[in-house]
Amino acid sequence: MTEAPTEFPPEDGTPRRELGGDWVIRILGEIKEEALKHFDPRLLIALGNYIHSRHGDTPEGARELIRILQRALFVHLRAGCNRSRISQTRRRTPFPAAPTPRGMY
């Protein structure tokens, strides 16, 4: 993957800022808090350990964890979580565009 472009310091001489560092930490905290309401904490710990073993304690690891948790929460809520306002009313498949395989009615 390509690296993020280097940010040049502002003309007024203020120090450089980290690209999205504070935002990533804040969003990760919010998503982890929401994920704990819907998923088993042991699963989230295992996922965090897996991401940490692949990326270490880096912003890339935090971003990957955010992406995975966002997708998991979306699918979970779309499939019909009782706590969700966006869940579907009919309880068939969370992906209505995917046809049911033959013989599996």
From Swiss-Prot:
Recorded hits in Gene3D superfamilies, A to Z, give:
6.10.210.10, VpR/VpX protein, C-terminal domain
Q: Which GO terms describe its biological process?
A: symbiont entry into host cell; symbiont-mediated arrest of host cell cycle during G2/M transition; viral penetration into host nucleus
Cellular component terms (Gene Ontology): host cell; host cell nucleus; virion component
Q: What is its main location?
A: virion
Entry keyword set: Activator, AIDS, Cell cycle, Host G2/M cell cycle arrest by virus, Host nucleus, Host-virus interaction, Modulation of host cell cycle by virus, Phosphoprotein, Transcription, Transcription regulation, Viral penetration into host nucleus, Virion, Virus entry into host cell
**Superkingdom classification of source:** Viruses
- Renumbered to this chain, region (Disordered) spans 85-105
Entry's localization field: Virion; Host nucleus
Q: Name one Pfam family in it.
A: VPR
List residues, modification Phosphoserine.
S84
Is the keyword Transcription regulation in the record?
yes
Quaternary structure and interacting proteins, as annotated: Interacts with human UNG.
Q: What does this protein do?
A: Stimulates gene expression driven by the HIV-2 LTR. Prevents infected cells from undergoing mitosis and proliferating, by inducing arrest or delay in the G2 phase of the cell cycle. Cell cycle arrest creates a favorable environment for maximizing viral expression and production.
Name of this protein: Protein Vpr
Q: What is the lineage of its organism?
A: Viruses, Riboviria, Pararnavirae, Artverviricota, Revtraviricetes
